[in-house]
């Protein structure tokens, strides 16, 4: 597969599922994707319900047989992206190898432009990609929105990360 380039997303303040669908679409187009600040992505909904649902997923199954659900925010985000790819095919497995998810911003990516809510950091990216990532923005204009950050959810599930 020919690669079109590398995209770097800043997940801060973006809705988890919308970001994952955009990333999956760009992986299928042929981009390599890196996501920073995974712990700052949000899941909309009542925080207590979200915690309850994810705890039920993590506790489900058997220690030996699974299903195995991640607790760390970077692994949760990668698992959500995996669910939007055809992971049981060779192509899907190859696509998943082209995703890197980070907690925080690593040193090598600090100075590079990133796609996210802060448009000043997106210099150098095509206008279409910038508009696409803005679709992952939460709809705050309808009033107060209930949400939980992925880092907070992970700590509730028992993850230890910095």
Curated annotation (Swiss-Prot):
Where would you find the membrane-spanning parts of this chain?
none
Q: Which GO terms describe its biological process?
A: negative regulation of translation; translation
Any one of the GO CC terms:
cytosolic large ribosomal subunit
Q: In Gene Ontology terms, what is one molecular function of this protein?
A: structural constituent of ribosome
Q: Which UniProt keywords apply?
A: Ribonucleoprotein, Ribosomal protein
InterPro entries attached here? Ribosomal_uL13, Ribosomal_uL13_CS, Ribosomal_uL13_euk/arc, Ribosomal_uL13_sf
One Pfam family from the record: Ribosomal_L13
Gene3D superfamilies recorded:
Ribosomal protein L13 (3.90.1180.10)
Name the domain of life.
Archaea
Name the job this protein performs. This protein is one of the early assembly proteins of the 50S ribosomal subunit, although it is not seen to bind rRNA by itself. It is important during the early stages of 50S assembly.
This protein's assembly is summarised as: Part of the 50S ribosomal subunit.
Family assignment from sequence similarity = Belongs to the universal ribosomal protein uL13 family.
How is this protein named in the record?
Answer: Large ribosomal subunit protein uL13
């Amino acid at each position: 597969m020919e690669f079109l380039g590398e995209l770097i997303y800043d997940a801060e303040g973006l809705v988890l599922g919308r970001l994952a669908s955009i990333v999956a679409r760009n992986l299928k187009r042929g981009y390599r994707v890196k996501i920073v600040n995974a712990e700052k992505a949000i899941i909309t909904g009542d925080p207590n319900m979200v915690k309850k649902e994810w705890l039920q997923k993590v506790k489900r199954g058997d220690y030996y047989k699974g299903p195995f659900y991640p607790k760390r925010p970077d692994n949760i985000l990668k698992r959500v992206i995996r669910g939007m790819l055809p992971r049981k095919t060779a192509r899907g497995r190859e696509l998943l190898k082209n995703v890197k998810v980070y907690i925080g911003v690593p040193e090598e990516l600090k100075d590079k432009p990133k796609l996210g809510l802060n448009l000043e950091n997106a210099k150098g990216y095509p206008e279409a990609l910038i508009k696409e990532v803005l679709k992952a923005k939460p709809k705050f204009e309808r009033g107060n929105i209930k949400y939980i950050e992925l880092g907070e959810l992970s700590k509730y599930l028992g993850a230890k990360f910095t």
